[in-house]
From Swiss-Prot:
GO terms for molecular function: tryptophan synthase activity. Pathway: Amino-acid biosynthesis; L-tryptophan biosynthesis; L-tryptophan from chorismate: step 5/5. Transmembrane segments: none annotated. NCBIfam families: trpA. The active site is at E31 (proton acceptor), D42 (proton acceptor). GO terms for cellular component: cytosol. The alpha subunit is responsible for the aldol cleavage of indoleglycerol phosphate to indole and glyceraldehyde 3-phosphate. This is Tryptophan synthase alpha chain. Pfam families: Trp_syntA. HAMAP family: Trp_synth_alpha. The keyword Phosphoprotein does not apply. The lineage of its organism: Bacteria, Bacillati, Bacillota, Bacilli, Bacillales. PROSITE patterns: TRP_SYNTHASE_ALPHA. It is an enzyme of class 4 (lyase).
Length: 243
């Protein structure tokens, strides 16, 4: 199986354009951030993009409407990254109905603890959308096994004990943790948070089944030309294909 490339984009008014660009240039799954006023798990770059998206008028209704209109023209899978407040305010059942209608593959809910995630999946088992589990590098082996056993879609490992986009070294125990998670998991294990360049990708994806790139993608969408952006995306895809 080829390594998974999962870029993150903010769900702003142009997100469908960015989604299609990524899909056409090697993304396997695209993570779409739902803009939120208090994004506790986001670093400054994604936080700023979220504020801008809110200011220009984007919201979860707009995101669902655009996905429903365009789902048949998008070849990659896509997941929504949303805080529980948005889901709760929308109504859990209605939110998941819309996910099904919009072709959403999975949900990442970073502020929903594992115990509540397990209950959530049990309550809404009849929906096709998958609830993606996150595992921090600080989690014990027992905790990892517990989460992995009940995970679906893919497992998202947080490669640094920090918010997204934070520069610096990856956790020194990273590879051992990822290898252990893979050992106890029946689904792909991807790594994210802090990955920026092909060197990072080569290092992490030598053990992980794929990578998530968030802040670097969001930053490049803002500052790069379309040609530069596509060149960067292709460099990540090429690196993954070489492993």
């Amino acid at each position: 199986m080829s390594k998974l490339f999962i870029p993150y984009i903010m769900g702003d008014l142009n997100f469908i354009h960015h989604l299609k660009t990524l899909t056409e240039n090697g993304a396997d799954i695209v993570e779409i951030g739902v803009p939120f006023s208090d994004p506790v798990a986001d670093g400054p770059i994604i936080m700023k993009a979220g504020r801008n998206a809110i200011d220009e008028g984007s919201n979860i209704k707009f995101i669902f409407d655009e996905l429903i209109k365009n789902k048949n023209t998008i070849s990659s899978k896509y997941v929504l990254m949303t805080y529980y407040n948005i889901l709760s305010a929308y109504g859990e059942e209605l939110f998941l109905d819309k996910c099904d209608e919009a072709g959403v593959y999975g949900l990442i809910i970073p502020d929903l603890p594992y115990e509540l995630t397990k209950k959530f999946k049990k309550d809404f088992y009849h929906h096709s959308v998958k609830i993606i589990s996150l595992i921090a590098m600080t989690a014990s082996d027992a905790r990892i096994m517990q989460i992995a056993k009940n995970s679906e879609g893919f497992i998202y490992t947080v490669t640094m004990n920090a918010t997204t986009g934070n520069s610096g070294e990856f956790h020194p125990d990273l590879k051992r943790k990822i290898e252990y998670i893979k050992k106890v998991s029946k689904i792909p294990v991807v790594a994210g948070f802090g990955i920026k360049n092909p060197e990072h990708v080569k290092d992490i994806a030598s053990v992980a089944d794929g990578i998530v790139i968030g802040s670097e993608i969001v930053k490049r969408i803002e500052i790069d030309s379309r040609k530069e952006f596509i060149t960067y995306i292709k460099s990540i895809r090429t690196t993954l294909n070489s492993l």
